[in-house]
Amino acid sequence: MVSDGQVFPVPADLARDAHIDAAAYDAALARVEADPEGYWRDIAARLDWITPPTKIKDVSYAKEDFRIRWYEDGVLNVSANCIDRHLPAKKDDVALVFEGDEPGTSSTLTYGQLHEEVCRMANVLKAQGVKKGDRVTIYLPMVPLAAVAMLACARIGAVHSVVFGGFSPDSIAGRIQDCASHFVITADEGRRGGRRVPLKANIDEALKHCPWVGKVLMIRWTGADVPLKAGRDIVWQDVRDTVSADCPPEPMNAEDPLFILYTSGSTGKPKGVLHTTGGYLAWASWTFWAVFDYKPGEVFWCTADVGWVTGHSYVVYGPLANGGTSLIFEGVPNYPTPSRFWEVIDKHQVSIFYTAPTALRALMREGDAHVTKNDLSSLRLLGSVGEPINPEAWLWYHRVVGKEKLPIVDTWWQTETGGMLITPLPGATALKPGSASKPLPGVKPQLVDAEGKFLDGATEGNLVITDSWPGQMRTVYGDHQRFFETYFSTYPGKYFTGDGCRRDADGYYWITGRVDDVINVSGHRLGTAEIESALVAHETVAEAAVVGYPHDIKGQGVYAYVTLKAGIEATDALRKDLVLWVRHEIGPFAAPDVIQWAPGLPKTRSGKIMRRILRKIAENELGSLGDTSTLADPSVVDDLVKNRAGT
Ligand code: WTA
C-alpha cells in the first residue's frame, strides 16, 4: 500500500530547465490574484491575433446574467495559429508523425505540407458549399488527415463535430441530427489492432436517418471497395488536386464556435459541448507548453483518439499551436504485441508520452520485459489522463517506464474544461502517486458538501470550480438552458464538475471519481442512462438499470440489471444477444461486462430507482446497502443480492 506520505520531489535538473519552476508557479499564483486581467492577457498573447483583444474576461455564473466570454473583441484564426505562423521558421520541420496500425508503416507531414493539405481540404469544403458557421461531422480513423480535416474546418470557420470511430451508425445519426450538420468527412475504412473498421458503411447506415446530409467527403485509406452514392459522395483523392493549394484563413471572433464534441452526462442524450475560438486555443496552447514543459524539436505523443477531447486538445490543437511535433498512432497498445507502445517510442524518439491509466494497467499485466527490452532513453516526461490512476499503476509507470527518473503529470480535466485544470507542473510540483496535485494558476477549485457549503482544509467532498478559465465550454449546442441547469444550478454560482474529490493537508487534490451517473470505462466516458435506453429498446427488455463497478483493467466496468418482459425466458443466449445489441446501438466500448437478470428493481414508493443500492450490490459491498425499508418492495433487494453476478 502507498500512503499519502510518499512524495517524489522535483528532479533538480528538470526544475532548472523547466518553463515553470516552483518560484515561477508561486509568482503566477500571486500575479493572477493581483492582476488577473494582465495574467490572462499574457496567456492570450501566446497566440497570433488579427485584432488583439482589449476585453479580457466577462463572466457571471449567476442565473440572472449568466455569461462566459473571454477575449470577446479579439479576432484570430485557429488554423493560422497552428500552421501559418510557424511557416517562416519551421516550414520543413515535422508537424505530424504518423505511425500506422501495422508496424513498419509510418510517415511524416512537415508544417509546409500540413499547410498545403489543410488549404486544399478547406478549398474542397468551400467548393462543396460549406460556409462559416456550418457544422461538419468528422468520422475518421486516427490518421493525419483527421487533424487536416479539423484544421480545414477551422480555416474556413466551419464548426467541426468529430465522432469517435468506435460509435455505431445510430450514435452517429444522433450526433448529426442534434447539430443539423449537412456535411460528413469519413474514410473507406479504418484499421485497429489488425482489424478493419467499416467507417463508410457505418456512415451510409447513419445517413438513412439523415436525408438532409447532402455531401460526404470520403478519404481512400485502406483502398477497400466501398459503394459510392452518386451526387452525394466525393473522394478526397479525386478532388484534392482540382483546388488551389492556398486558402486564406477566415478571420474569426474569439467567441465564434470552433467545435462541438458530444459527451455523456448523467441524464438524457449526449450533450454537444461547444468550445469557442480564442479562449479554447489559448488554454490548449498554454497548458500544453506549461504542463508538458514542451521544448522545440521534441516529439510529443498523446495516445488518445481525436474522437475524444484529449485528442482535440493534445494531439492536434495544443501541440500545433506551439509549433510542436505530434505523433498520431492509428493502432492499439497490444497489437501486434504488448511491446508496441514502447517500440514506437524508440522508433520515433518520443520525448513526452501521455496515455490513460487503463492502457497502463493492461500493459502492466503483461510483464515488465515488454517494456524493458526497449531503450526508452528518449523519454523525458510521462503523463496520465482520463480517470484516476491507482498508485500501483502510477508506481509501475514511474519505475518500469520512467526508470525512477521521469516525472508523471497526472492531469485532471474534462471535455467541458477544454484543457487541464488540476495537474502537477513537472518543474514545480512534488508528486504523490494517485494525486492530480494542485490547480493551475487562475483555476479555483473548492470542495463542497451536499448543500454546497465550502469545506476547508483536509477534507472530502464534491469538486466545484468557482471561477472561469479561458478554455471553459460556452454552451450545450442548441440548449443553453441545459448548459446552465447541468453545471451551474446544483451549487448556484459555481461550476459543478460531477467529480468527488479529497484534499489532503498539503492542499493536494485526489479525484475519487464521478458522483453522478457517468461512468468511466477504459477511459471512455459513458452515461448509464444511454446504456439503459439502448437496453430497453430491445424487444425483450421491460426495464434496465446500469451502474459502474470497479474493474481491474478498465477502471470501471458496466454492470446492467435487466428486467425482462413477461413470458420472456432469461437464457445465456439472450444475455449474449443483449451485449451485442448494446455494441450495435452505441458502440463496442459500451457493451455491458455483466448482465444480471432482475425480476424487480429497488424503487422508492414514488417509483424512483435506488441506484445507490444497485451500485453497492455491483461493487459487492453488501454490508453497506443502507436503509432499504423505504423501498416499495424491500424483498427485491434480497433477490438481487442472492443472484448477484460474480465480478
Ligand atoms: C475523469 C477527459 C482522475 C473525471 C479529459 C472527469 C480523471 C472525467 C482524470 C472527464 C484524472 C479525467 N484523474 N479522474 N487525471 N482525468 N478524469 O470528459 O471523472 O472524457 O470528470 O475528459 O474523467 O472525462 P472526459
UniProtKB/Swiss-Prot annotation:
Keywords: Acetylation, ATP-binding, Ligase, Magnesium, Metal-binding, Nucleotide-binding. GO terms for cellular component: cytosol. The keyword ATP-binding applies. ATP binds at residues 386-388, 410-415, 499, 514, 525. One of its GO terms (biological process) is acetyl-CoA biosynthetic process from acetate. Acetylated. Deacetylation by the SIR2-homolog deacetylase activates the enzyme. CoA binds at residues 192-195, 310, 334, 522, 583. Mg(2+) binds at residues 536, 538, 541. GO terms for molecular function: acetate-CoA ligase activity; AMP binding; ATP binding; metal ion binding. Its cofactor is Mg(2+). It catalyses: acetate + ATP + CoA = acetyl-CoA + AMP + diphosphate. Its EC number is 6.2.1.1. Catalyzes the conversion of acetate into acetyl-CoA (AcCoA), an essential intermediate at the junction of anabolic and catabolic pathways. AcsA undergoes a two-step reaction. In the first half reaction, AcsA combines acetate with ATP to form acetyl-adenylate (AcAMP) intermediate. In the second half reaction, it can then transfer the acetyl group from AcAMP to the sulfhydryl group of CoA, forming the product AcCoA. Belongs to the ATP-dependent AMP-binding enzyme family. HAMAP family: Ac_CoA_synth. This is Acetyl-coenzyme A synthetase. It comes from Caulobacter vibrioides (strain ATCC 19089 / CIP 103742 / CB 15) (Caulobacter crescentus).
